[in-house]
Amino acid sequence: MSVQLDAYLFFPGNTEQAIGFYQQVFGGQVTITRRRDVDPTATPEQRNQVINALLTGGDITLRASDREDTSISPQTRVELSLIGTDDARLRAVFDGLAGGGAVLAKLERQFWGDIFGSVIDKYGIGWQVNIGTAGA
């Protein structure tokens, strides 16, 4: 049996906008479940909260939700790493993620032989992009 890792991201009330941004970058389909869809006891303030957003297809699977926890900050999140050999696709993804964000390291050839760069997107999520050579 194979193992698959899906990233699950938490946002302070703007999950729908964030997952829409990632859909523009990666492609795929989005499914959103709001608290009102599954919790009949939700207060009026909670009804529109995204309790699960799922982006599937395209290059990746991402899951996300709104979280009321105010301790969430870019410093408490992880960086996501994209690794592959499709140079054109990974460069386009890098540029898409950089839109409205900040490039920390330009895509450049590194001492280990691959092209690597990193960016923090406009939602504060860090991304590492590593473009390897085919067959490596």
Predicted regions and their residues:
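Vicinal oxygen chelate
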Residues: 2-3, 31-33, 51, 56, ...
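Short, well-ordered beta-strand elements within core beta-sheets of diverse protein domains
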Residues: 7-10, 80-83
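Core segments of cupin and vicinal oxygen chelate
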Residues: 9-59
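A short, polar/proline- and glycine-enriched secondary-structure boundary/capping micro-motif
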Residues: 74-77
